[in-house]
Amino acid sequence: QRQMCIRDRASKDADIIFTCVGNDDDVREVILGSNGVIHSLKNKAIIVDHTTASSVLAEELDKHINKAGGSFVDAPLSGGQAGAESGQLTIMVGGEKVVFSKVRPVMNNYAKACTLIGGVGSGQKAKMVNQICIASHLINCISHCSKINNGRYSCEILKNNSTWSE
């Protein structure tokens, strides 16, 4: 009962609703679940999900939200806690251009870069590529560090430069 009350107050009059939770199941529950915001969604409202989730889920949510009279964009974040605290996040957005133009001014308040990649799901796909690039870069650095000075070189110095930044 309490969850429904919170959901209704949080979403029934909102033009834009932002979510950022743990994973696909959490997003699905918050938006589509029995107490999900979709049940009190205002006509023509926009749901922006900042969770790093799957592109398949983004496409699923888009269908349900459109059917309920709203719009959806997937907009995963990059930059971590430090980026969030300093308003320097990078946001990769998937959705319609007209919907993006409505939510971008809000996201510009906490992002240094907010880019429309393509249709719904594209933001998640771009984030996946970003994560693969970061992991590949770190693996490459660690591999090369082990070869310096017959493996006696410490990789600690790399923690203090851009190699370890998100």
Where does each model-flagged region fall?
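A general structural signal for well-ordered alpha-helical segments in protein cores
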Residues: 14, 24, 28, 34, ...
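Helical "substrate-binding/catalytic lid" subdomain
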Residues: 121-166
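Rossmann-fold dinucleotide-binding core
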Residues: 50-135
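Short, small-residue-biased leader/transition segments that mark boundaries at the very start
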Residues: 2-6
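Rossmann-fold NAD(P) dinucleotide-binding segment
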Residues: 7-71
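Residue-level "edge-of-site" marker
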Residues: 9, 24, 78, 120, ...
